[in-house]
Amino acid sequence: MTNTKKSKQKNTVGNKVKKTNTNKNNNNNNNNNNKNKQNKINNKNNKNNKNNDSNNKNNNTNNKNNINIKNKNLKKVENNKSLKVISSNKNKNILNNLKKEEKVNSNDILIQQQQNREKEDITNEDDDEKYNLWNPKPTSSVSVSSSKSSKSLKTTDLQNEMSEKLKGSRFRWLNETLYTTHSKEAFKEFSEDRSLFDQYHSGFKSQVESWPINPLDLIIDDLSSIKQRKRIADLGCGEAKLAERLQHKHTIQSFDLVAVNERVTACDISNLPLKNESIDIAVFCLSLMGTNFIDFIIEAERVLVKGGLLKIAEIESRITDINAFTNEIQQHGFNLIKKNEQNQYFTLFEFSKLQKKDQQFMRSLKQYQKLKKQQATNEPVLKPCLYKKR
C-alpha cells in the first residue's frame, strides 16, 4: 500500500514536473514567438527607416538637381541679358557707323552737287539764268583740287553749308509763292504765320550780299539829292531801310505784308491806308510781286499827287519786253520820264503822274497798243521769278 501510494505520489510529482516543463516550454515558445514578432516588427521598421532614408536621399538629390537646374536657368537668363546688352551695343555701334556713313555720303553728295553746279554755270548760256538774281552763281569757283581738299572739312562746316543752302531753297520757294499768288492771299498767309515773312527776309538778305549792287542803294542816292522835303511811300519796303537812311531828309511811310519793325505798316499794297493824292513819290524796289501787280500801280496812281513821281526798280530777266512794260504802266495814268538800263541785272524806271485831262487820251491810246501787243504775243509784261529746279 505504501508502495502504491509512493508510486502515485511519484507520478503526481512527475506530472507536475512535466506540466511545469510544458509550461516552461510553452512560455519559452511564446517568448520566442514574441521575440520573432518583435524582430519582424523591428525588421520592418528598419526597412521603413531605410526606405525613408533612401527617400530622403532621393529628395535631397532631387532638391540638389532642382537647385542646379535653377542655377543653370539663372545663368542662362543672365547670359541672355548679357547677350541682349551686347547685341544692343552692337546695334548701337552699327547705327552709329551707319550715321557716320550717311554723313560721309551726304558730304560727298554735297561736293558732287557743287561740282555739277559749277559745270552747269560754265556751260549754261541761257540769258534768264544769267540774269536771274534769285538763283545767283557762286561768288568764287571751286577747283578740282580744292574740292578734294574740302572732303577734309569738319562736319560742322558742311552742316552749316547745307543749312545755308536749305535756307536759300526756302527763300526761293517763298519768293516764287509771292510772285505767283494774289496779294490779298499773300497778306492773309503772312499775317497768320509771321515766321514765313521772317524766313523770306532772312533769305533775301543772304541773296543781296551776293549781288554786285543793290538797286535800293541807287534809289536812296537819287532821293537824297532832292533838296525839298518830300512825302515818300516805300511800297514793299521789307525792313524799311529807305526810311532808316532818309528819315532826316524826307517824310517816309513804309508798307509791306508784315510789320517787321516800328517803321513798317502791315497791309496789302493793292489797298493802301492812305488818302487820295497824299504822296509825292512812290517807290517799288523789286516789289511788283503777285499776280495782281497792276493793282499796285493803280493804287500808287490814286495816292500820288498830280505830277508825283513813280520809281520802279525791276530785275532785267523779268521784263519780257521793255516797251510793253512801260506802255502797261503809262496806260494807268503815268508818263515815262527816264529809264536806266546801264546795269546788266536791274532796270530803273521813273514815271510821273499825268494831269486829269491827259489821262483819258493816254489810256485809250495805250489800251489800243496793249491789245495789239497781246495779239502778237501772249507773254505777260513781267514774268514771275521762278526757282529753277536742278
From Swiss-Prot:
Any one GO MF annotation of this record: methyltransferase activity
Region (Disordered): 1-85, 106-160
Keywords: Chromatin regulator, Methyltransferase, Nucleus, Repressor, rRNA processing, S-adenosyl-L-methionine, Transcription, Transcription regulation, Transferase
GO cellular component: chromatin silencing complex; nucleolus; rDNA heterochromatin
Subcellular location: Nucleus, Nucleolus
GO terms of biological process kind: methylation; rDNA heterochromatin formation; rRNA processing
Positions bound to S-adenosyl-L-methionine: 201, 236, 256, 268, 285
EC number annotated for this UniProt entry: 2.1.1.-
Ranges annotated as biased composition (Low complexity): 22-71, 140-152
Superkingdom assignment: Eukaryota
UniProt family annotation: Belongs to the methyltransferase superfamily. RRP8 family.
Stored PANTHER family: RIBOSOMAL RNA-PROCESSING PROTEIN 8 (PTHR12787:SF0)
Function, in words: Probable methyltransferase required to silence rDNA.
Protein's name according to its UniProt entry: Ribosomal RNA-processing protein 8
GN (gene name): rrp8
